[in-house]
């Protein structure tokens, strides 16, 4: 059996050993959505050609000095408040010394001694499909990102576009008792920072990178660096837990170290450093940050409604949405705004929004866009159905036409163009309905036989054919009445 097959089988059968307690803490590095870098006026860059978005400071040119970007500070403060942290009135920057090719300064500017915020928490709950659980946070610190090293055959290339990009590092306490809690926390954190427009929230693009510190039975902790997806986090933690348990069962010793994840196993990178190894010193070129004592309350008033609050509101009266629908809206703010715009303006808004409008976009293989079917247009379409000016089928035809053709015509123009207005009641109309129904009955003997045996749902097949034949001009209830009369 190959190594990969054995690995997949082992993770698939994963379970916790009751004699070996899992404990985990996270360090989450989050790129802030700023226009410029943390300590220079270079634009932040994610998809540009290598080494094209740089300043002299970004590349560590001697004599250049850092200048703090206030936009990055504001986003870091907003994140700290959203994470229920205590904003510190005094914070400062420090130099973390180490040598690596992607760090041209020879040190990283971070906040080791006096971070921006401390003592936060995140509450896991029913909205995360989890029992209530509080995950405490040690601190939130503002720091600069490194560049990237890219391996090409026998060469290592360095791209410094990412160097000096603003980050926050969120450090949790080791409160995670299982991997499900870790996964739920990371999902919740992603949603929070993307919802507040602090970060894109993407793991796969590197906008969020996770380091996990795991220990078993309070033995020395092992850090797993740079986990870049939810799947990597889960698989790496499962593997590392099994590795440590196996080691302890065989009278081995866990050493404090840093390990990486290669897609199959964790592998040792280096002995775990401590603060002495990094030679932290205050950065003499950056002033300390002093904040007004009322800054926390002021920031609280500027935050958008937080995700849990939105979910709580949407799953209660008057919306009464299923949690899955509420989550989908929360992940797409533009669609949430649309939904709240039409709610209260039309009856049965949930049916029209989810089962008619979004379904019409999906069936047309078109991504939802507010300006294709405006809220006012949807309200007008529903109103026309309620006034019996068009049928439900007619409304569906109109929606499909608008979406596929990006039509900007008015509703009356569309009704006329598509010829789906309800015909005036007359003897001729009654005769036409009777004739259509009789013809459908004559050509669907098997369906008629099912109805005769008591399968009344089969009547819907006949009604559907009648609606199609009349382009939805006649309401389904009229066809239902006529079929029931003819089939007595």
Swiss-Prot record:
Name of this protein: Glutamyl-tRNA(Gln) amidotransferase subunit B, mitochondrial
Gene: PET112
EC number: 6.3.5.-
GO cellular component, one term: mitochondrion
PANTHER family the record matches: GLUTAMYL-TRNA GLN AMIDOTRANSFERASE SUBUNIT B MITOCHONDRIAL AND PROKARYOTIC PET112-RELATED (PTHR11659), GLUTAMYL-TRNA(GLN) AMIDOTRANSFERASE SUBUNIT B, MITOCHONDRIAL (PTHR11659:SF0)
Function comment: Allows the formation of correctly charged Gln-tRNA(Gln) through the transamidation of misacylated Glu-tRNA(Gln) in the mitochondria. The reaction takes place in the presence of glutamine and ATP through an activated gamma-phospho-Glu-tRNA(Gln).
Entry-linked SUPFAM superfamilies: GatB/YqeY motif, Glutamine synthetase/guanido kinase
Localization: Mitochondrion
Catalytic activity, reaction form: L-glutamyl-tRNA(Gln) + L-glutamine + ATP + H2O = L-glutaminyl-tRNA(Gln) + L-glutamate + ADP + phosphate + H(+)
One GO MF term: ATP binding
Pfam families assigned: GatB_N, GatB_Yqey
């Amino acid at each position: 059996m190959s190594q990969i097959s054995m690995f997949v089988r082992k993770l698939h059968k994963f379970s916790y050993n009751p004699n070996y307690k899992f404990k985990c803490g996270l360090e989450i590095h989050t790129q802030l959505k700023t226009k410029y870098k943390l300590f220079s006026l270079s634009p932040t860059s994610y998809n540009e050609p290598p080494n094209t978005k740089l300043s002299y400071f970004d590349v560590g040119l001697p004599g250049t000095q850092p200048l703090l970007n206030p936009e990055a500070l504001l986003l870091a403060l907003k994140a700290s408040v959203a994470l229920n942290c205590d904003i510190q009135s005094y914070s400062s920057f420090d130099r973390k010394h180490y040598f690596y090719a992607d760090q041209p300064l020879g040190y990283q500017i971070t906040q080791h001694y006096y971070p921006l915020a401390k003592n936060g928490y995140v509450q896991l709950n029913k909205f995360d499909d989890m029992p209530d659980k509080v995950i405490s946070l040690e601190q939130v610190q503002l720091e600069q990102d490194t560049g990237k090293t890219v391996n090409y055959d026998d060469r290592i290339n360095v791209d410094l576009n990412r160097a000096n990009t603003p980050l926050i590092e969120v450090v949790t306490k080791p409160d995670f008792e299982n991997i499900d809690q870790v996964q739920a926390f990371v999902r919740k954190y992603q949603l929070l920072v993307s919802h507040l427009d602090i970060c894109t929230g993407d793991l796969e693009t590197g906008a969020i990178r996770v380091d996990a510190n795991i220990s078993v039975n309070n033995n020395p902790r092992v850090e797993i660096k740079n986990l870049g997806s939810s799947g990597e986090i889960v698989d790496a933690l499962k593997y590392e837990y099994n590795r440590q348990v196996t080691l302890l069962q065989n009278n081995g010793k866990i050493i404090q170290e840093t390990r990486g994840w290669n897609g199959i196993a964790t592998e040792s990178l280096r002995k775990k450093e401590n603060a002495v190894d990094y030679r932290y010193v205050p950065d003499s070129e950056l002033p300390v940050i002093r904040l007004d004592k009322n800054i926390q309350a002021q920031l609280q008033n500027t935050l958008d409604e937080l995700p849990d609050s939105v979910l709580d509101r949407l799953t209660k009266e008057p919306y009464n949405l299923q949690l899955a629908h509420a989550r989908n809206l929360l992940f797409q703010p533009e669609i949430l705004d649309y939904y709240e715009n039409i709610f209260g303006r039309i009856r049965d808004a949930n049916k029209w929004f989810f089962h008619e409008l979004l379904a019409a976009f999906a069936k047309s293989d078109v991504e939802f866009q507010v300006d294709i079917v405006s809220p006012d247009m949807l309200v007008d379409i529903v109103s026309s159905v309620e006034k019996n000016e068009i049928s439900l089928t007619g409304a569906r035809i109109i929606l499909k036409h608008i979406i596929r053709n990006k039509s900007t015509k008015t509703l009356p123009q569309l009704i006329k163009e598509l010829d789906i207005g309800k015909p005036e009641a007359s003897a001729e109309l009654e005769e036409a309905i009777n004739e259509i129904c009789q013809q459908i009955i004559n050509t669907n003997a098997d369906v008629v036989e099912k109805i005769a045996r008591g399968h009344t749902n089969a009547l819907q097949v006949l009604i559907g054919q009648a609606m199609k034949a009349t382009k939805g001009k006649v309401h389904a209830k009229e066809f239902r009445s006529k079929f029931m009369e003819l089939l007595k």
